[in-house]
Design a protein with these regions (language model features):
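Small-aliphatic-rich amphipathic alpha-helix that forms the alpha element of a beta-alpha
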Residues: 50, 71, 98, 139-152, ...
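Bacterial N-terminal signal peptides
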Residues: 8-18
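N-terminal amphipathic, basic helical "cap/leader" segment at the start of enzyme domains
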Residues: 24-137
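Short beta-strand element of the conserved SAM-dependent methyltransferase core
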Residues: 57, 143, 214-216
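A solvent-exposed interaction/effector surface
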Residues: 22, 198-201
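A glycine-rich helix N-cap at a beta->alpha junction
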Residues: 203-220
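Bacterial N-terminal signal peptides that target proteins for export
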Residues: 1-9
Length: 220
């Protein structure tokens, strides 16, 4: 009995030491490891290698926790005081949320805390697009604009909120493209999505709208 208790304690300690496991707070939150922001491929070389890859991906193996952390930080992480991000945002709305669909579940990225909120443990990758390869890739990002945050002094501006939200999304998507080029990962941004199906699966509010999706995978 004593050995069993000790063994359980050791297993618990090992899980606590694995990034995103012990810090998962009962499975609701996954704390990402700090992003590695030093080094990397020179910008001009990454621009030269940037490309869109449609299917033909390699093995459906998940990205490592560290690569996922680096990717999300590059996409729209906090890079200076005041909560400002790696991607510009019109009027500093910061109104684009990044949802992740992977084989093991659905998640929402919190850039301020640099962690993932677990929204579900089912494989819902198919909702991320209409192309067959979205279910083959280890990661699909879904960019959702929150129009409730697209305001000036609390006043909504419907005449510009959608256009500016598309621009904000594009900034983030390009950051992901450059990161993937640097890490030699396959990537493609996609507009062929079903916003209604996404809204239902992600349980979005009426003020939220799916803008684009982006697939990340390993090359074959």
């Amino acid at each position: 009995m004593k050995r069993t208790v000790i063994a359980c304690a050791v297993v618990g300690l090992m899980l606590w030491m694995v990034p995103g496991t012990a810090s998962a707070q009962g499975g609701d939150v996954i704390k990402l490891p700090p992003a590695q922001t030093g080094g990397g491929m020179p910008l001009m070389q990454a621009l030269k290698l940037r490309q869109s890859t449609r299917g033909g991906f390699g093995p459906d193996k998940p990205l490592s926790m560290q690569v996922l952390s680096n990717l999300l930080w590059a996409a729209d992480g906090v890079n200076r005081e005041g909560g400002h991000r790696t991607a510009p945002s019109a009027a500093d709305w910061q109104n684009i949320d990044i949802y992740l669909t992977m084989a093991d579940g659905l998640y929402l990225y919190d850039p301020i805390k640099h962690e993932l909120k677990v929204l579900g443990r089912e494989d819902v990758r198919a909702v991320a697009g209409q192309q067959p390869f979205v279910t083959e890739a280890p990661l699909n990002l879904i960019y959702v604009a929150d129009m409730a945050r697209a305001s000036f002094g609390g006043k909504r501006m419907p005449e510009v909120e959608e256009t500016w939200s598309y621009a904000n999304t594009a900034f983030i998507a390009q950051n992901v493209y450059l990161f993937c080029a640097s890490e030699k990962l396959a990537c493609i941004v996609r507009a062929m999505i079903d916003p209604a199906a996404i809204a239902k699966t992600l349980k979005l509010r009426p003020e939220q709208k799916a803008i684009l999706a982006q697939t990340v995978a390993h090359f074959k």
